[in-house]
């Protein structure tokens, strides 16, 4: 299968009937206004992206940053017209857009399909109604369910965008959202931990002490759980964390929050860390003391004869298993000082294996 070649056009906040507490699309995307999005500009941009690499990728135009199906019909025609021409000419392979769950009625979907749009990404953010109210989203979890169902009726590919870390978020609401979204069976999910952006209500709440953003480590844990959950339910997570932009990197727009350009890599690191730790915990509980209900596993380890732990992994997974800047190695050294831990790159295998005192656990 060819890799995706995304050609993004940002329409910051266009079509949005509400101003969410966290939203400042111009700051996030580094773009403002859409007057430059003329038919000629759209065609030229597509041509520049594709160039001589037409057959190298699956090229898809994406309209992001606003509620596409909520903008005026004339503007939808203006944006989709030249894009559809490029689709018919075989220069691109697909078109997608992002929108609100309460803006995908039958007429809206029919219009999209008339221009060859096959993928719609819904800005869901959370499936907890109280969090949606706090964020001033203007839609409910039930409307998300109805939107996905309606898009499915028209055989559209459906994506869901989530924002863990909104005001009122807890592990309980994270799990609630994970379960509810997996029941909808979207084709893919994007996970963007909440950032506090300048000139937003959330920034005002943060400065007033009314909102506490996620730490980077907590954001990583939330995202790792969500990613693992969706993957277990055969739902692809295509991105974790906002893409780096000059505006965000400059620090002029970012007030607070877990902005980390390597968030996707860190989340995968966390997934492997948790898998290894589960092996250790299960081994200790079964072979060392079958009733650890009154003991903390770490305390038990500190009083038990050292175990020998070897972790084997293929070269392709070295950085993912060991962690960015060896963060997983450091974590296990500090948390389990009484374990003899060794890390081995093994070119003969294609899986990760945790070996504890001769017993192998395949991750």
Residue ranges and their predicted role:
Residues 28-40, 44, 65-220:
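Conserved non-cysteine loop/helix-boundary elements of the Radical SAM core domain that shape
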Residues 44-52, 82-86, 111, 150, ...:
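A generic secondary-structure signal
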Residues 53-58, 89-92, 300-307:
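Short helix-terminating capping/connector loops at secondary-structure junctions
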């Amino acid at each position: 299968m060819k890799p995706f070649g995304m050609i993004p056009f940002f329409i910051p906040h266009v079509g949005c009937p509400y101003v969410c507490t966290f939203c400042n699309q111009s700051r996030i995307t580094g773009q403002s206004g859409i007057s430059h999005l003329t038919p000629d500009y759209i065609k030229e941009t597509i041509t520049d992206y594709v160039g001589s690499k037409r057959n190298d990728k699956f090229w898809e135009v994406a309209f992001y940053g606003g509620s596409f199906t909520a903008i005026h019909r004339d503007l939808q025609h203006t944006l989709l017209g030249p894009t559809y021409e490029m689709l018919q000419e075989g220069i691109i392979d697909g078109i997608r857009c992002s929108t609100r769950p309460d803006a995908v009625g039958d007429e809206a979907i029919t219009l999209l399909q008339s221009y060859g749009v096959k993928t719609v990404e819904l800005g869901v953010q959370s499936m907890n109604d109280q969090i949606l109210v706090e964020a001033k989203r203007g839609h409910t979890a039930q409307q998300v369910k109805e939107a996905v169902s309606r898009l499915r009726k028209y055989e559209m590919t459906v994506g869901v965008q989530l924002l863990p870390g909104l005001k009122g978020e807890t592990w309980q609401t994270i799990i609630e959202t994970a379960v509810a979204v997996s029941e909808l069976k979207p084709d893919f999910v994007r996970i963007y931990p909440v950032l506090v952006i300048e000139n937003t209500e959330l920034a005002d709440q943060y400065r007033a002490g009314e909102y506490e953003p996620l730490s980077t480590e907590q954001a990583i844990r939330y995202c790792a759980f969500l990613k693992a959950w969706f993957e277990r339910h055969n739902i692809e997570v295509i991105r974790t964390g906002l893409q780096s932009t000059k505006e965000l990197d400059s620090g002029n727009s970012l007030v607070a929050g877990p902005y980390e350009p390597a968030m996707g890599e860190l989340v995968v690191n966390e997934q492997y860390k948790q898998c290894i730790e589960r092996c250790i915990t299960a081994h200790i509980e079964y072979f060392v003391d079958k009733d650890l209900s009154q003991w903390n596993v770490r305390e038990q380890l500190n009083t038990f004869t050292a175990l020998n732990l070897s972790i084997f992994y293929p070269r392709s997974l070295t950085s993912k298993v060991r962690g960015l800047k060896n963060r997983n190695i450091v974590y296990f050294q500090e948390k389990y000082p009484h374990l003899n831990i060794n890390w081995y790159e093994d070119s003969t295998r294609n899986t990760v294996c945790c070996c504890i005192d001769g017993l192998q656990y395949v991750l």
